[in-house]
Every structure is written in C-alpha cells, then in structure tokens.
Curated annotation (Swiss-Prot):
Source organism per UniProt: Acanthamoeba castellanii (Amoeba)
Protein name per its UniProtKB record: NADH-ubiquinone oxidoreductase 75 kDa subunit
Domain (4Fe-4S Mo/W bis-MGD-type) ranges: 217-273
Coiled coil location: none
Gene Ontology BP term (one): ATP synthesis coupled electron transport
List of residues binding [4Fe-4S] cluster 2: C148, C151, C154, C198
Amino acid sequence: MKNISFKVNDFQYTINNKLTLIQACLKNKVDISRFCFHEKLSIAGNCRMCLVEDLKQVKPLASCAINVSNSMNIYTNTLKVKKARESVLEFLLANHPLDCPICDQGGECDLQDQSVVFGSDRGRFYEFKRSVEDKDCGPLIKTIMNRCIHCTRCVRFSNEVAGVNILGVTGRGSKMEIGFYIENLMRSELSGNVIDLCPVGALTSKPFAFTSRPWELKSYNSIDVLDSLHSNIRVDIRGTKIMRILPRVNSELNEDWITDKIRFSYDSFRRQRLYDPMVKISGSFLKIGWKKAMLFIKKFFCNFLGFNHSSFIPLRGYIGDYLDLETIYTFKKFLLLNGSNFFLPSSSYNDLTALYSFNTPLTRLDEGDFCILLDVNLRVELPIVNSRIKQLVSKKMLPVFVLGFYSNFNYFVKHISNSSKTLLHVLEGSHWLSAKISKKFSSKPIFLIGDSSSLLKGSLIVPLFNFTNVICDNWNGLNIISNDSSYLSTKEFNLSSSHSQNSHLLNFPINFVLNYDKAVLVDSSAFQIYQGHHGDTNAINSNLIFPSTSFIEKNSFYSNSLAIVQKTKKILFSPGNSRDDWKILNALIDNFGFSYFKVRNSFDLVSFLSESTPFILYKRSFSFKCFGFYEQLVYHFFNYFSVNNNYYIYDSITRNSKIMSLCFNKFKMKGYNFF
C-alpha cells in the first residue's frame, strides 16, 4: 500500500493514498468544517462546506470527494476558502427558520457553530422561506423538516447501517425534501442514531423535547447492559434524573451507534422500583428494615433445618440478566456455603470458553468469506452486530445462510431449513451447502449461533470442527449469541442462567430469585426470596423481597459476550433502602455465620475475582483448542421455532418504560412485525 506526501497549510504529512483529503486531514488532527461528511457513512458531497484551496486548481475543491495525491499543497484557512464557506452558509441559511431559541439542538448545533465562525453578519435573501411538512417517524424521533439542510446523513444511515430503505430525497431545487416515499414509520432498532447524525434540529429526540439544555447536564460514561455486547454509552443527568443516553465511540464494539432500547428506556429507572425490604404476611407485603429482614431469613432457615433434620439448606437459585461479576461470584459462594449444587451438566462443554462466547473480534468480521446464522434472530438479540453483517453484505457481497426460524432480515439471506437435521446433512457433506462451507472452499467462515441451539449440547460440535475451518490458525469463527447480558459471566462461574436444564428440581422448598424476570414454575408451598430492582411478577409471588440497585447506581464489573470486561459507574444514588446485589448476598453469608468468606468492600471482592477468573484483570486471548477428544453424542432432531420477537418489551427494565410501551403499541397498531 503506497504512502504519499502532501502539504496542508504548509505542514508536510504522509498518508495512505486511498484516503480522501478530508479523511487525511482528520487523521492528522487538521479540522475541516463539514455537514454531510461522516466517517461511518458513504460520501455524498452535498453541503460543499468542506471546500479547500489547492494552489494548482482554479476553483476550491470539495475535500470529501477528492483523493489525496502526491505533492498536493492544500490550504484550509485562506481568504478564498473563507469566502466560499460564507457563501455556502448564506445559501443554507436562506431557507432556515429563525427558531433557534426553541430548538432542541441549541448548544449542539453544527450550523450555529459554523455560522459564528464562517457566516456573514447580514443576509441578502428577501423572498419567502419555504415550508416543508413534518414527517411522522414514530414515538422516538421528532421531525421539523423546515430546518433540514439536505445533508442526507439520515438517508445514508437508514440505507447503509440500519438496513431499512425507507428514507429518500424527492423533488428538485426549492421543492427538494427528505422523507418517506410512502407514509411510513422509522421501523429500525437503531433509528435513534439519526438524532445524533443530524447536524441541525430537523431530527431530535421526541422524549427529550423541551426538557433541558446541554449545558444543564452532567455527563457520565457507562456501558449498555441491555444486550450482551455492552456498547459504550454516555449518560446525561440533571439533578437526580436521567435526561438522555447517548453513544460513546468504540471501534471494537459499537462504533458510533447504540440501540433504541438503551437510548430510550431510561425512564424505567424511576418507575416500579423496589425501595425497602418487604415480607409477605397474610397475602400483603409489609415493609421491614434490613436488620429485621436478616433476622427473619435467619430464623426461617434455622427453623427449616430443625424441622427437617437437615444439615444443609435445599436452596435453588434463579439467575437473571444484567448481573455484574461481583454479584454472580458472591451468589455462587452463597449457594455453595448453603450446600446447594446448581451447576450445569458437563455435556454443555462449560470447560471451553470458546463454546459460549463471541470469539471473532468485531473488527475482523470483514475477513470472513461466509456466514451462517443458526437458530438466532440477530436483529433482535444483537442489533449492532447485525448492522455490521448488513454492511458486509452490501459492500463485500458476503453470502449469508439461515438455519432456523426465518425472521424479517434487513439484508439478503438464503433460508435453508427449519430443521436441525439439515445441519447434520450439511456437515456430513450430503447437502448442496456442504461444498460452500467445507475446508476446501471457505477459509474463514463465520458461524453465529443462538445460545439455545442444539449445537451447543455437543451433538454436532465435533462434525462442525472437522468439516469446516471455523477454528483454525489465527481464526475463530464460532460465535454464540445470547439475549442474556450476563450469559458468559454465568458460564464462566459454571452457573446456569436458565432453569430449563434443571427442570427435575422444580420441587425445591426454597427458591432464591436473583433479578430473574422470567416466569418461575414452582410449587405454591415453596418459600421464595426475590432480589431485584424492579417490581415484577416474581416479586409479587415472593415471600421476601430484597431491593437492589440497577447498573447505573453502582460501580461494578461486567463481562460482555466477547469476554471484554468493562466497568459501570455509579451515576445516581440508589433509591430508598436498596443496596448493591453483592452486598446483600455478602450480608446473608455473614448472617449465617460463614466467617471464612470475609468481604468488606469492593476491593476485597475484586481480589477474590481476579484469583478465580483471570480474564478480570487480563484481556482473554482467543485460544484455538483441539476439540477432537470430545466424544460425539446422540443426535436429537427437532424444528427451530421463533425466538423472542418483542424487541421493545423484553425484561423488567423495558417493561417498566413508558417510552418502550409507546413504541410497542405504535408498531403493533401499524401492524409491523419486522423482527
């Protein structure tokens, strides 16, 4: 790859010749004003705000559309450039409304900022300003199309990243406008990102409208635990209230995007929260303090042991989503100290991390030459990864085949079958797809597999590794997809986040439900303890409730599906008398007199964690192990069924979000089943 030298403002730079001029300047910290250009979108060249002067050219050049050439001499701050930008701004402002004081983009508006620097002090436009009808994009995006400057960022994002080809440009001249070709809604799980992309106030957040100004907000960095990727986010608060959630750039994970679920579900952190420990007496809940709650549970356990003449407590745990590593580790210790044995059977291959993690770095997905989706609805479970696959299909014509339930994909796929028996035929070489994924024809295949797939039970693991190059030198294309944010963490500690594999233990007399929001099928006579942050069905059916904090109210470590450990920050104070999950469990351990597990603060707990799980301190390198020593199990054939299609209302957080409920009802009313 050839490097060339060029000059910008009389400073010499060396850069790759495949870059455009604006990309080369941005890489070398030379700022060039722009509206339509964005690093993650294709080049449009609409706004002409990025004009620069080349001494070899008569007219200014659009730096976003010109590749760097050798010995190029560019100036970005000459009088000619400034006059050109002033003229461009004059045309943009000619039809722009003068409603800046009531615009939600105020303080973050690129048009305002660049008008101050490059704009004129007067206007020469005396005609009527044009008027454009606002579009209905749904309950998330507010449109005021009079402010639109036709940068087409939203159009390119919807087509190239979100994969919904519903936005476009119609008309010419003064009648040109951006909108839907037919009346439609922005039906994408990434639609909120157009709010960040819009350089003016044409597209703004509808829930955030008229609530606060950017300079009134305090910003904190955190992560999105509502899916297993853990995208990087920025949480803006005012006082004790979350006002909005925005993305943070992370090229290894979410790039510049986040999902609508984390962006708009922030209102749920103030609704249906559990504030105090409660005990159920005669069918009604009574508030009690933490001391009384600990005394109650200790007395109950002592009475149970004495009545049943038992030396251990038959306690069964249910582990839910959104649990941090400290909580999972402490919960495992709590179960062990009470004599419980709630671990996965060895047939699930829990001793190999590669069999329950996302092994291919997202930055290397473009190296894949083939992709198979097995029993997974990628658009619902990991929308960011789905967006990356969509871009590979568009740019590299990546072939994608689906084995499992067919959902509404936003890119071209070939659906093979609903039966798991077809996968066996493929791996045996008797199917037409066998030739395409064999070691001879595919050097770097990508397998995206749902966590409920039969493949994970071991029956087809060995044929997969023997027939394909899914794991070879310098490549691991085996990727497990899960809706559960703490899926990998529970596997690392050899715990199950699902009760289905232990259905024969339904008659346990005591159940401990740890932030588990799915239905718990237990005997009505069983004593149930619920620990969580939102009041849900399992809380109502419990005998004792411990209120805990959510991820925005504590400093905790979380591991995503790629085994990348990140930390959340305590942004808000915990409501009422709620406590961190691990602190509640640690208090229970102390309450039962287990003195040999002493944890007094988070630093002690991190020390325990680093000893038991090395990937806490050291980023896990991807190992390419030999799986040949595993015995092949008996085949079990069945048809794949649809996984959860309700993207907006899935868990205790989104179920308590008014905004998510509006989204669900709006799309349901319109009859959209786009997942």
